[in-house]
Amino acid sequence: MMPKHFMTLCAIVLLSLTIGGLAFAQASKRHQQAVQQKPFGTQDGRPVTLYTLTNANGVEVDTMNYGGIILSIRVPDRKGQFADIVLGHESLEGYVPNPPYIGAVVGRYANRIANGTFTLDGKAYSLPKNDGPNTLHGGTDKTFNKVVWDGEPLKGKAGVTYTYLSKDGDDGFPGNVKVRVTYTLTNSNELVIDYEATTDKATPINLSQHSYFNLAGEGTGDILNHELMLNADRFTPVDKNLIPTGELRPVKGTPLDFTAPTKVGSRIDDSYDQLVLGHGYDHNWVINRKGNGLTLAARMYEPTSGRVLEVSTTQPGVQFYTGNFLDGTVTGKQGHVYKRRYGFCLETQHFPDSPNHPDFPSTILKPGEAFRSKTVFKFSTK
């Protein structure tokens, strides 16, 4: 017969193991790939839902079906400390309106179309002008950043698919266009964005994601100390209205040469004409590629935190924008005021104003065809 104190000790050990096992199971469950959703208000009489994507490493992405907007991305630094690295707001109301397009899916046509017009199959189309003489990010009314999409969480993955029908004539564009955007967060700390579209009439299509990143943490200051590499030997120079001239200019010998890692702020205020026109960087780079597959476009590194963002895409171009027009009038999360150059965008895309430049890669989607593109944001540290 065992002594009573020995039996008591065994019971305590068993209880401790049970409690520890439950705690471990709960912790593991918390860090499995998952999608959580909750009501986030209403817009235009339709419910808006917030989706939180979580992977096995504890990385989280918040997105909503209004505008396909990414509200937050929480990733660790080199010490394992998590921070939100995208500009944004804590409520739906902060995104209505959203002049800087913070976090949004932009379309039908991301970037600029000169003079708000293009000709297709012999017919001229007029679009709303919302950027001086130009149309920016699709116009003013039914642009993709201003509408409520249908949302459906993915099964067995940390992801969500948004779908939207852009009707014939919306913002002047032809064709009923069915659009699908899927966000998937992998256990490799990749946010994968898949874009798809079909149409019943020929129409231009150019879709992108307009998140503003600050790898030191949103609201912590400017991004001038970040170090950027762009896999691009050429860019598309612009005129005074930020419309491509049609030239594909070599970056070598210019402040737009990021073929080797370079501090964003080291040349941003040079007197080079393109920087003067853009008030900093706001240009499309021509990605070096050998085929149509996924290709590294950019790598950004923030030395204080050690965070790294790599952007790969199937698209031909990437717009690097340094938040030159953030002017302190936008107050974001935790009361942070977003001042000039407090965030950067890396917008994968077709070239700006392609419908008016037949020598650029075509953006015309025709009936019976499908537009598909993929962009991957990969987060790491060094």
Describe the residue ranges of each PLM region.
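An exposed, glycine/acidic-rich loop-and-rim segment of catalytic or binding clefts
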Residues: 26-59, 65-382
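Bacterial N-terminal signal peptides
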Residues: 10-21
